[in-house]
Amino acid sequence: MAIVKCKPTSAGRRHVVKIVNPELHKGKPYAPLLGTKSKTGGRNNLGRITTRHIGGGHKQHYRVIDFKRNKLDIPAVVERLEYDPNRSANIALVLYKDGERRYILAPKGLSAGDQIQSGINAPIKIGNSLPMRNIPVGSTVHNVELKPGKGGQIARSAGAYVQIIAREGNYVTLRLRSGEMRKVLSECVATIGEVGNSEHMLRVLGKAGANRWRGVRPTVRGTAMNPVDHPHGGGEGRNFGKHPVTPWGVQTKGKKTRHNKRTDKYIVRRRGK
């Protein structure tokens, strides 16, 4: 994988930094695993904006990813690595011995031709998926389930991983990249290794249009608006003279956003501490 800085042949190319991976498949994706993906423009069924800064962008197909890894004890071979426009990570097309193909998240170090497997008998090897009670303490994993059988929910983006730091009773303790430590049932399944394409964070789009291709619309500062549009709006100059808030008046600096009290007992240490 190479990090390429473009030559300044135009203003839009001057600052572009691209991530080039020659291992990625250059043809079309595997059609039976594609789904439709409709544009919402950030609107709900009433036509009202519920999420700002969404609209336009290139048409995309959804790739159906196997987050559950529930095809047990059947070996599979990696056919190819592919780009996925719906996520920061790359994906791998795997062919199982019984002839079925599935997409999985491509871990770091996985290449075409490698063999992977799921189940309690799977060896501790990059790309293999098994319950965390069978994974040694200290291992790095990704695509971690929060509930047995629900499919991976933690550590799915490019370069993400979780470390198993303890096992006690029916639970394992995980250390997340954010610094949070939380308990998860040891029956939950995780995949060995970290998610690939960790250089994703180093890319530079270089121009506003590149964000528009991705369906991201401009973000206007509150201080640049009128008082009717934002609590920061109006006044002379750029000072708005109050604590910063969202367009709906909710504090933005340090306000707690977590409301799921039911699972607080599983968090051993909060993030950022």
Curated annotation (Swiss-Prot):
Keywords: Ribonucleoprotein, Ribosomal protein, RNA-binding, rRNA-binding. Belongs to the universal ribosomal protein uL2 family. One of the primary rRNA binding proteins. Required for association of the 30S and 50S subunits to form the 70S ribosome, for tRNA binding and peptide bond formation. It has been suggested to have peptidyltransferase activity; this is somewhat controversial. Makes several contacts with the 16S rRNA in the 70S ribosome. This is Large ribosomal subunit protein uL2. GO terms for molecular function: rRNA binding; structural constituent of ribosome; transferase activity. Disulfide bonds: none annotated. GO terms for biological process: cytoplasmic translation. SMART domains: Ribosomal_L2, Ribosomal_L2_C. Residues 221-263 are annotated as: Disordered. Part of the 50S ribosomal subunit. Forms a bridge to the 30S subunit in the 70S ribosome. It comes from Histophilus somni (strain 2336). GO terms for cellular component: large ribosomal subunit. PANTHER family: LARGE RIBOSOMAL SUBUNIT PROTEIN UL2M, RIBOSOMAL PROTEIN L2. Residues 253-263 have a biased composition (Basic residues). It comes from the Bacteria. The lineage of its organism: Bacteria, Pseudomonadati, Pseudomonadota, Gammaproteobacteria, Pasteurellales.
